[in-house]
């Protein structure tokens, strides 16, 4: 049988693998080249009855664009119909390279994933994800996921679990404004001890995501659990995943030279969640802030502060202690409906089972969604250096039309006869200045901001005695975290005593 003959070629080949529906065979054996090429031609001429039964391999979202840069391609029509083939120049220096396009794959020869998520209908329709976030932002993240059409499954501190199609990975990464990372949940298992953890991790379908040559480093956290040693947890999880992948691909050694899949674990109350990171760089890194002032505010937290303050077109938005300008920029991005991740890259762009066209389409949709608005914001700071940095960040974010940046003492601002909202992040005394200086500033803020009749004031600080120092009780207080610093977000809706 020709199919059996082709299977025997695998043993004589030095390397056989799939790359985006392109079959590549490298070999030093000249006779193998002619035998294999003969089979290839017959296969392209529709002699498919000799092919062993198999399921067609699909790419999530369609065929991915582009191929590796190590060979050149020539496009021409296939003798089988309208499908395009890519027949590159053959370079015979150290080895022979034979490439031909096929309509369906031979799973026993596929070097990548023996069993891929794209072969399962439910992978396209439903995948479980985890959106991580700063403590206190879970509600905003959940509401955002609802608006993006996802199905929430549950929430714990700093994590929102939900379902969505795998094809939505690009759209979610580009649009999530308050989340820190988007993780694929591979599985969950009990973890009262290392043996149970090992067996649980080994039972998970890692080969559905990770190829035989791919990298899979491990990191994570353990909270309120008996397994407290993170290095030991990493070692056990790595070993279990390697055991599963080695068995799936028939390998004793995994080279880990390919695409990087960052495995993350979260063990909470002796239950482990195993995930793969699709974001790479945390989502709070939008790409518009290459340089920042000392103790910068994380972009996701700044966006949450702006959202809670409800920016409006007819109300002046002011940050009189702007630092890097992050709060004003995030407010303008909300008002213009600018996707926060539109100008950055993501780890999942390298995943071969996720169609590259999905990323292009998601970015095109995000660009089309940007809205015109009359929103206006002032970002000012007493430091000329901070003003310079903020102005550059505003320019890089594309928000110069909506944000005016200038130097000014926060204790000298005036209403100018306009309605307004102040949102600020004054020094805490923990990261900037001293506690005594911060307390003096809070007292001065209370005296001066009281003169801004009818303006709404929003202040983020870690000082639990802020209201006493400010001289007024807040109308609402919300617990938020700036990194690992526990803060309170004080909200004064009617600025009158």
Regions found by a protein language model. Give the residues of each.
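C-terminal catalytic and target-recognition region of SAM-dependent MTase-like enzymes
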Residues: 410-412, 416-497
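Non-catalytic nucleic-acid substrate-recognition regions in nucleic-acid-modifying enzymes
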Residues: 122-259
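Intrinsically disordered, glycine-rich low-complexity segments
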Residues: 1-5, 11-16, 20-21, 46-49, ...
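Compositionally biased, intrinsically disordered low-complexity segments enriched in Pro/Arg/Gln/His
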Residues: 5-12, 16, 26, 38-45, ...
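S-adenosyl-L-methionine
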Residues: 125-137, 141-143, 147, 160-176, ...
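A short, flexible beta-alpha/helix-coil linker loop
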Residues: 223-226, 282, 427-431
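Conserved S-adenosyl-L-methionine
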Residues: 297-414, 430-431, 435-437
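Short hydrophobic targeting helices and cationic amphipathic motifs
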Residues: 9, 18, 34-38, 44, ...
